[in-house]
Amino acid sequence: PVKDRVEDLLKRMTLEEKVGQMNQFVGVEHIKANSAVMTEEELKNNTANAFYPGFTEKDIEKWTEEGLIGSFLHVLTIEEANYLQSLAMKSRLQIPIIFGIDAIHGNANAPDNTVYPTNINLACSFDTLMAYKIARQTAKEMRAMNMHWTFNPNVEVARDARWGRVGETYGEDPYLVTLLGVQSVKGYQGDLNGNEDVLACIKHFVGGSEPINGTNGSPTDLSERTLREVFFPPFEAGVKAGAMSLMTAHNELNGIPCHS
């Protein structure tokens, strides 16, 4: 049973291996593609393009073999996923890699996958069944690519039209956002027992959609009433629907960073 396997692994893992399971890197092909077009200064200083200063793809391959990486994102081909998984199987405890991706409106980052309308367009339909069906089909296509985890649905409530991520949301109404978010979670995850199910991730907790200057990641200043009436309900419903993960926000809320 999975529970017994997990408990056994936790007893046998070193502290370094446990920390390693919390490490997530982009795929080696993504690093190669970005580093090929970056200047020397960018290579040394920049992380925005998924390059890790001081490290190369060889380092990441080595850490994977040592069981010090738990998950990858931006792995866009079956071949690369299989390669990285084969490295993980050489590790001491052979803990499999989890592959995650921003499958926001279909698995659109990967080639030859179905691209659906964005979440804001889906919200215009008020069609909860369609939200479920899109998530279900996206999950099937993800698993066909050896992907296990989508960073969706975005259940932030759109509050500022200047904010650049409005298109990822289900709009400005907390009730509608909640309904569509819950159906998306159910569609992605199914019963989590089959080879057509993926992990959902409700995001971003919390308040990032009302930044003080309209810029993504900027500070937010929100009352407790606004948080409880507007921002919390979609997340609470997502958790109750069984969402297997939650992404914290990139902003600070009332002077306190949502994550560090």
What is the predicted role of each segment?
Residues 1-260:
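Glycoside hydrolase catalytic-domain context in secreted enzymes
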